[in-house]
Amino acid sequence: VMFSSGAMKSKVDLLDASRMLFAKGYQIYATAGTAAFLNAHGVDATPVYWPDEKPGAENNVMKMIADHKFDLIVNIPKNHSKRELTNGYRIRRGAIDHNIPLITNARLASAFIEAFCELKLSDIQIKSWQEYK
């Protein structure tokens, strides 16, 4: 799972979710600022380079996306600077182009990850579409 969580509020909002994934044994990757935050709060996160940093490096996020190293990408925009928008766009576009699930909202990401980590298949009752109407 790769996190690029943007502003401090988003980092805090995603902390419990990233802890859950880490506790379940998932490998956590994150862009530099997010990785530093997660590591400082007990989540072992491997830093990855932004798209415009060291493009040929093994741990450049775009190379890792192309190599399908992530099963989920959580990318929360931080600000509207040209660099931030371009890098964020490239990550989101790469996720879509390589069929990697992408979440761009911190609250939605937290809810999804909590459900993913806490619910078992036996907890979910499968119904036909008509039963939901």
Regions found by a protein language model. Name each.
Residues V1-P101, A109-F112, I126-K133:
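ATP-dependent carboxylate/acyl-activation modules
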